[in-house]
Regions:
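Cytosolic regulatory regions of ion transport systems
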Residues: 1-225
Length: 225
């Protein structure tokens, strides 16, 4: 049984169904963040693998409402469905979670059509991990960004190198928002942690910046660094 960083409240408990690559990583990350996690899978090998890493792990058929009730899933306010390849099991699991009263359901989808079906049977949040990762990698390959995250509304955050003309100047003096429309969120110098950006923050040569803005603004800024 995994030990948590803090004692979780009931609202912080999460059930993760499907302990493959995606679901397992989500579950493990939630435990590290201090949440109580119930892992559910019908594969005994996966159940055994995760038994020492998660708070609780059980073997059960997630498409069966009675089975979910018996293992205590109905007591969890939030669920993540990490089943991807078996679309029928994915949909039936979301439906079963809805029927037993789980309030908030996150579900992995492998296609837009799959995602629409998941929403129609009760998933409030649909995740497309392969598509999101593919788009992220494409941005990194075709730009000078070091890391990139894009949100659904066209807003993006990127890690990129500071422009050469920024060296030794304050953020207020550089005026990146005026020039590019981006907001500098953090600044990192070699050998130091990121610090929150302020107008008076000086940008040493070779610094790394965390910037936020529209996807177009962030891309334009990264291209200029």
């Amino acid at each position: 049984m995994a030990s948590n960083a803090k004692a979780p409240t009931a609202d912080e408990n999460v059930v993760v169904i499907g302990l493959g690559r995606f679901g397992g990583q989500v579950a493990e990350s939630l435990v590290r963040l201090g949440h109580e996690v119930l892992g559910v899978d019908d594969d005994p090998k996966l159940v055994q693998h995760w038994s020492e890493k998660l708070t609780h792990v059980v073997q059960a058929d997630s498409t069966d409402e009675d089975a979910l009730r018996q293992v205590g899933v109905a007591e969890f306010p939030r669920a993540v469905v990490g089943i991807g390849t078996d679309i029928e099991a994915s949909v039936l699991t979301v439906l079963a979670l809805t029927e037993i009263g789980v309030r908030e359901i996150w579900a992995k989808a492998t296609s837009v059509k799959h995602g629409k079906i998941l929403r129609s049977v009760g998933a409030q949040h649909v995740i497309y991990p392969e598509a999101a990762m593919g788009e992220r990698v494409a941005h990194l390959i075709t730009s000078r960004m070091l890391d990139f995250i894009e949100f659904d509304d066209g807003f993006a955050i990127a890690k990129t190198r500071a422009p050469e003309d920024a060296a030794g100047r304050t953020l207020a003096d550089i005026g990146l928002r005026t020039r590019y429309g981006v907001t500098v969120v953090g600044v990192k110098t070699r050998g130091s942690d990121f610090v929150y950006a302020r107008p008076e923050t000086v940008v040493p040569a070779g610094s790394i910046l965390i910037v936020a803005g529209t996807t177009e603004q962030v891309q334009r800024f990264a291209a200029a660094t």
